[in-house]
Regions:
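Short, Lys/Arg-rich, polar N-terminal cytosolic tail immediately upstream
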Residues: 1-5
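Juxtamembrane helix-capping/reentrant segments at transmembrane boundaries
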Residues: 8, 67-83
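Helix-coil boundary and interhelical linker segments in multi-pass alpha-helical membrane proteins
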Residues: 23-41, 92-106, 143-155, 194-200
């Protein structure tokens, strides 16, 4: 069972969810953007949210700044999370200002905001589950899209919630997090898009 839960944690890793979210967005939301524009944007998202974070973790492990790719301790998480806050904010700015795809910009502003809340928690020696944070963001994002486009994305929302439950169970079984860290991660992720949408 431990091996299964490890596989689940890898497949639904936080750096994978943003790319999946953007792919779902392009599938579900009608737009007049050319396929080449969508592909360019998807490539930018993949590089910024997957390849760069992966490279950062590899470099940090080589430099012995982290012991494992999970960056388990609060101290190990500080610098990677700080870099992710900046990366996601710059990505949101780039997408909003160059393509006008404000919905996707919202997704990454929200991610930056949720990571900022996570970073603030470090000062209180609180760690949050980034796996659950990413799924909380995805859940809330598609709820907001439902309001914006007067459509129901209930299937996506329900699947997100079910996956969050599976991942939460996996992280708890692997003793990667405590229940409070799992709940806090999903909570920060869920409220971030709502907050960004309300204020922007």
């Amino acid at each position: 069972m431990k091996k299964v839960y490890k596989i689940i944690s890898v497949i639904l890793h936080p750096i994978v969810i943003p790319t999946i979210g953007v792919i779902l967005y392009f599938i579900l939301i009608p737009s007049n953007y050319a396929s080449s524009t969508k592909l360019t944007l998807l490539s930018l998202v993949f590089v910024t949210t997957y390849l760069i974070p992966l490279l950062i973790l590899v470099v940090f492990k080589r430099l012995k700044l982290i012991q494992t790719f999970n960056a388990d301790s609060i101290q190990e998480r500080k610098l990677p999370v700080a870099m992710m806050i900046v990366l996601f904010y710059l990505l949101a700015n780039t997408i909003t200002n160059t393509t006008g795809m404000n919905d996707i910009g919202l997704l990454f502003y929200a991610t930056s905001a949720a990571l900022t809340a996570t970073y603030v928690c470090f000062a209180f020696q609180l760690k949050t589950s980034l796996h659950l944070l990413s799924l909380g963001i995805s859940t809330s994002f598609f709820i907001i899209l439902g309001f914006i486009y007067a459509s129901s994305f209930s299937t996506v929302v329900v699947v997100n919630i079910l996956l969050a439950g599976v991942v939460a169970n996996a992280r708890l079984y692997l003793k990667a997090h405590t229940p409070s860290e799992v709940y806090l991660g999903f909570f920060f992720g869920f409220i971030a898009p709502l907050g960004v949408y309300y204020f922007l």
